[in-house]
Amino acid sequence: MIMKRILTKLAVVLIAVSAPAMASSQALEGRWANAKRSVIVKVSRCGDAYCGTISWASAHNREKGTTPGTRVLSDLKPAGDGVYKGRAFEPKRDISGSATVRQVGPDVMIVKGCAVMGLFCKEQRWTRIS
């Protein structure tokens, strides 16, 4: 009887601990717009990680090289506390570097890309669009 109570409590704790992790990883998937709403990126599973591909760009951004179908985030893997780390690509400048994506709410994430050994970084606030 005591063993059954212990196992039940352990199961409840494990479910409580794993539920937020599952919810946050699923929440990363979707369509996200930059602050100017000039680019929309679709984030989805890519094997054992996440990636982000441009699904729409304004005419101005397309002229500058930001074209739909371009992968701008890759190999994003959980790093804890709603943070994902991977790679970023900036198509306007043709630069790749490290990426950190931090979910600050169900519909808001901060995307930071750094290049040249972390010397040059750019951070943007993206919002989920339905």
Predicted regions and their residues:
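Central antiparallel beta-sheet cores of small beta-barrel/beta-sandwich binding domains
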Residues: L28-A99
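Edge beta-strand at a domain terminus
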Residues: V116-S130
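C-terminal structural segments of small proteins and small subunits
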Residues: A99-Q103, D107-C114, G118
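Predominantly extracellular/luminal cell-surface or secreted proteins
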Residues: S55-A57, C114, I129
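Sec/Tat signal peptide C-region and signal peptidase I cleavage site
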Residues: A19-S25
